[in-house]
Curated annotation (Swiss-Prot):
CDD domains referenced in this protein's UniProt entry, alphabetically: Radical_SAM
Binding residues for [4Fe-4S] cluster 1: 33, 69, 103
A UniProt-annotated Pfam family: Radical_SAM
Entries under PANTHER family matching the protein: CDK5 REGULATORY SUBUNIT-ASSOCIATED PROTEIN 1 (PTHR43020), MITOCHONDRIAL TRNA METHYLTHIOTRANSFERASE CDK5RAP1 (PTHR43020:SF2)
Name listed for the protein in its UniProt record: tRNA-2-methylthio-N(6)-dimethylallyladenosine synthase
Co-factor: note: Binds 2 [4Fe-4S] clusters. One cluster is coordinated with 3 cysteines and an exchangeable S-adenosyl-L-methionine.
Gene Ontology MF terms in the entry: 4 iron, 4 sulfur cluster binding; metal ion binding; N6-isopentenyladenosine methylthiotransferase activity
Coiled-coil region list: none
Binding site for [4Fe-4S] cluster 2: 177, 181, 184
Catalytic activity: N(6)-dimethylallyladenosine(37) in tRNA + (sulfur carrier)-SH + AH2 + 2 S-adenosyl-L-methionine = 2-methylsulfanyl-N(6)-dimethylallyladenosine(37) in tRNA + (sulfur carrier)-H + 5'-deoxyadenosine + L-methionine + A + S-adenosyl-L-homocysteine + 2 H(+)
EC numbers for this chain: 2.8.4.3
Residues annotated as domain MTTase N-terminal: 24-140
Length: 532
């Protein structure tokens, strides 16, 4: 669907009255999941290929692009609040442009312009490649452009990219989701699952490694559903395809770390566990959403597994990788959840001993089956349960982290992970299991992207401390690339911290299929991965 809508709050002037394209700057603001971060890097790449340049830190951009999330009401409110903050500037600088894309744009469509008529471009999840052309059209025709495609026009990974990191990268293996979780709106916005061919994925990984990347994260709403038959999509999918992909990543020289997010417990198979344990560069870390420990609630959520199966997967993972860090997503206050149901969740959390959990309060989202269910719970009840769950998980996380004190860990040095690093004279990095470690680098020239070995000296629920100095330091091509300024740093809003090499401003996680996947939850999410 494509439409044009006249502006109500000022618009760009005629083409010959507008500054040259080469002078125009952009800023991309990202809300939501890792898939949105991946897509935002593509939006930035498209804009740079079209002649835009990234706005310098602390300056006003000529074009501001919002890549939105639709999973929670507070994500809606945050977007419209930020759009309102830009309205005065739009009135005084009509040549400035505002574009809104992503899941909320796909959902709200023309309603978005009714709420924020000063927006210039609205585009959806299926046509991000149209962004530069839509900006040009809005700028020259002086009318807002709304273009929402109903099917994927071009796989985002095939588009130009301006990555946030020189040392770590997202690699999408699929888009869309075939699950029907009752609380989740994402399948209706991103469509049915579409897989990339293994050859395309591995070619992208190789090209990233060739530029210095040492860590990749394979992305999908449900990565272990990967495996459509590319020869004949009507044939049964290859249920071993994801494990085969992990093993193939292990054959790429120079690729030191492989992560993935997120698997669905209903389709998690033992061949994936074997591939993780037997492939040296696949990290001993698993983020697998639980959502609830109550079988009755899981049934109402249409999650297609029960607590016993979930705990069985964890048991087999730990048997193969005793030191694996397992993290999860949990929703509190799903419609009809009783105290007995919630007690079952607490019991599973105690048994699972998660390293971290992203915990959320259920948020009623129009258009989802759960929004029509009876038994919507009072806010006070949900809040009280949420606080109990957070307290329990904080205790478990702290106990797990204290058990690592005195151990040596290998870190991929990161930038932006520790908000207090400047004050504490520390740097930060991620261990192979995804844990965040703040360490003292001393006077050595340690760079983001380098690999260091440190000994853990202290622990907190959300991070580890290593104040004993660096025991080993390996300079990498990734560190060289970072030092050479080959990375473009985006602006992120709303990203969880587990497993990410870069933590954005105002970290805030989403739920469902991933650590930043597709759930519908509200309130402050809690995790053991927040930067300190």
């Amino acid at each position: 669907m494509t439409s044009t809508v006249a502006h109500g709050a000022g618009s760009a002037g005629p083409a010959d009255d507008v500054e040259p394209m080469s002078a125009r700057t952009y800023q991309v603001r990202t809300y939501g999941c890792q898939m949105n971060v991946h897509d935002s890097e593509r939006m930035a790449g498209l804009l740079e290929a079209a002649g835009y340049r990234r706005a310098a830190e602390g300056t006003d951009a000529d074009v501001v692009v919002f890549n939105t999330c639709a999973v929670r009401e507070n994500a809606d409110n945050k977007l419209y609040g930020n759009l309102s903050h830009l309205a005065p500037r739009k009135r005084t600088s009509p040549d400035m442009q505002i574009a809104v894309g992503g899941c909320l744009a796909q959902k709200d469509r023309d309603a978005l312009l009714r709420k924020a008529p000063w927006v210039d471009v609205v585009f959806g999840t299926h046509n991000i490649g149209s962004l530069p052309a839509l900006l040009d059209r809005a700028r020259h025709n002086r009318v807002a452009q709304v273009e929402i495609a109903e099917a994927l026009q071009q796989f985002p990974s095939s588009l130009p990219s301006a990555r946030e990191s020189a040392y770590a990268a997202w690699v999408s293996i699929s888009v869309g989701c075939n699950n029907t979780c009752t609380f989740c709106i994402v399948p209706s916005l991103r469509g049915k699952e579409i897989d990339r061919s293994p050859a395309d994925i591995l070619a992208e990984v190789q090209s990233l490694v060739d530029t210095g990347v040492v860590e990749i994260t394979l992305l999908g709403q449900n990565v272990n559903a990967y495996g459509v038959s590319f020869a004949d999509p009507a044939l049964p999918r290859n249920r071993g395809a994801f494990a085969e992909l992990l093993r193939a990543c292990g054959d790429i020289d120079g690729l030191e770390r492989v992560r993935f997010t997120s698997p669905h417990p209903a389709e998690f198979t033992d061949d994936v566990i074997e591939a993780m344990a037997q492939t040296p560069n696949v990290c001993p870390a698993l983020h697998m959403p639980l959502q609830s420990g109550s079988d009755r609630v899981l049934r109402a959520m249409r999650r297609s597994y029960r607590a016993e199966r979930y705990l069985g997967i964890i048991e087999r993972v730990r048997a193969a990788m005793p030191h694996a860090a397992i993290t999860t997503d949990l929703i509190v206050g799903f419609p009809g959840e009783t105290e007995q149901d919630f007690a079952a969740t607490l019991d599973v959390v105690r048994q699972a001993r998660f390293s971290a959990a992203f915990t959320f309060q259920y948020s009623k989202r129009p258009g989802t089956p759960a929004a029509e269910l009876d038994g919507q719970l009072p806010k006070a009840v949900v809040q009280e349960r949420y606080e109990r769950l957070v307290e329990l998980q904080e205790q478990i996380s702290l106990e797990g982290n204290r058990a690592i004190v005195g151990q040596r860990v290998e870190l991929l040095v990161a930038t932006g992970e520790g908000r207090k690093d400047t004050l504490t004279a520390r740097m930060s990095g991620r261990a192979r299991d995804g844990r965040l470690v703040h360490f003292r680098a001393g006077d050595g020239p340690v760079r983001p992207g380098d690999i260091v070995t440190v000994e853990v000296t202290d622990a907190a629920p959300h991070h580890l401390i290593a104040d004993g100095g660096i025991l080993a330091h390996r300079r990498t091509r990734a560190g060289d690339a970072h030092a050479d300024g080959q990375t473009v740093r985006g602006i992120g809003l709303g990203m969880p911290g587990i497993g990410r090499p870069v933590v954005p401003v105002a970290a805030e996680a989403t739920s469902c299929g991933s650590a930043g996947g597709c759930g519908s939850a509200d309130g402050a999410g809690s995790s053991a991965g927040d930067p300190q």
